[in-house]
Amino acid sequence: DAPRGPAPDKKAGTKIEKLAQDWTADVKAFALAHEGDLVGIAPMDPLYVYEGYELTHPWVIVVGVSMEHEELDNLPPSLENTSNPVEVARQYNRAARPCRELNNFILSQGYEAKAWQGPFASALNMMPAAIQAGIGTLGKHGSLINEEFGSPFRISAVTTDIPLVGDAP
């Protein structure tokens, strides 16, 4: 597999029908079983989409992964010690993998899905979606802060039309 996870599969021809609360539980369990540390769901809001783009999926699933605090303690990076930037890149890749796996899971169930990986997710601004999905709150310094992990974690997302139930911010 690629460091950022598998390429998108083709969507299955038949939709599997379940209740929204059952899909919500399945989606969260799947992401957590595939390297995710946090999962939240929010209804899509046009404010999450950058100007010039259009996203039509009604839901956004945000997945977060924690970073290794020991590696972050090596700030600032230097020519002799490059572990901090390597850790950041490693965790962006780790955040991408559960979303790309989740994307393929949703496609295999007959629903539309698109994975968005950080740090630059083109059309999707993941920060407000993550706040609405209950992943964290916005800190004074502009970073997302999670109650358990603090600010050192990375996020990726999947937009989809699978029936879901949103989380509270």
Where are these regions (language model features)?
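Iron-sulfur (Fe-S) cluster-binding modules
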Residues: 1-42, 51-56
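Catalytic cores of enzyme domains
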Residues: 37-169
